[in-house]
Amino acid sequence: MDLPGLIHDFLLVFLGLGLILGGLGVVLLANPIYSAFSLGLVFVCISLFYILANSHFVAAAQLLIYVGAINVLIIFAVMFINGSEYSKDFHLWTVGDGVTSVVCTSLFVSLITTIPDTSWYGIIWTTKANQIIEQDLISNSQQIGIHLSTDFFLPFEFISIILLVALIGAIAVARQ
């Protein structure tokens, strides 16, 4: 999307805040339904980021697959869970939460210290040169097909297996 700089920056900050608030909602909200809706907010914000980056096909796929299918499946599964049996065993803070917090905080600090030291200039020009060559030869849908069948074949297959397992799990839960 070709927007003026100020509007583009405002939308980036607004969507970034939506991502942060949605992520915090997923982690901190005690009600699993609210957490699932917060996850939907995160997926929508990611989709809007793709629109800002001029990746309209990826944004549409993000909305259809993650918001339209995965998030609905999560909400469907959460609604089958009886909340009363889990709420009495709920402890506010456990040892695993502390270990996870330490690991995530150390990963965040290492990323924050690494990102400013990285030379992004060469990476950007190399990527742009590759994109120019690819854009001249084939269309966007052909590029996506080529990348899915070559560069991203293994992750694509893993995602399809995960979706198959989720679908089988949803059917098993629905039959009970």
Swiss-Prot record:
Q: What main location does UniProt list?
A: plastid
Does the UniProt entry include the keyword Lipoprotein?
Answer: no
Q: Known Pfam families for this protein?
A: Oxidored_q3
Q: Which Gene3D superfamilies match?
A: NADH-ubiquinone/plastoquinone oxidoreductase chain 6, subunit NuoJ
Cellular-component GO terms for this entry: chloroplast thylakoid membrane
Q: Name one GO molecular function term.
A: NADH dehydrogenase (ubiquinone) activity
Kindly state which reaction or reactions the protein catalyses: a plastoquinone + NADH + (n+1) H(+)(in) = a plastoquinol + NAD(+) + n H(+)(out); a plastoquinone + NADPH + (n+1) H(+)(in) = a plastoquinol + NADP(+) + n H(+)(out)
Report how it sits in the membrane: Multi-pass membrane protein
TM ranges are 10-30, 33-53, 61-81, 92-112, 152-172
Q: Where in the cell is it found?
A: Plastid, Chloroplast thylakoid membrane
Leading EC class? translocase
Listed InterPro entries: NAD(P)H-Q_Oxidoreduct_6, NADH_UbQ/plastoQ_OxRdtase_su6, Nuo/plastoQ_OxRdtase_6_NuoJ
Q: What is its EC number?
A: 7.1.1.-
Q: Which UniProt keywords apply?
A: Chloroplast, Membrane, NAD, NADP, Plastid, Plastoquinone, Quinone, Thylakoid, Translocase, Transmembrane, Transmembrane helix, Transport
Q: How does it assemble?
A: NDH is composed of at least 16 different subunits, 5 of which are encoded in the nucleus.
The record describes the protein's role as: NDH shuttles electrons from NAD(P)H:plastoquinone, via FMN and iron-sulfur (Fe-S) centers, to quinones in the photosynthetic chain and possibly in a chloroplast respiratory chain. The immediate electron acceptor for the enzyme in this species is believed to be plastoquinone. Couples the redox reaction to proton translocation, and thus conserves the redox energy in a proton gradient.
Query: Into which family does the record put it?
Result: Belongs to the complex I subunit 6 family.
List the protein's name. NAD(P)H-quinone oxidoreductase subunit 6, chloroplastic
Q: Which organism does this record belong to?
A: Guizotia abyssinica (Niger)
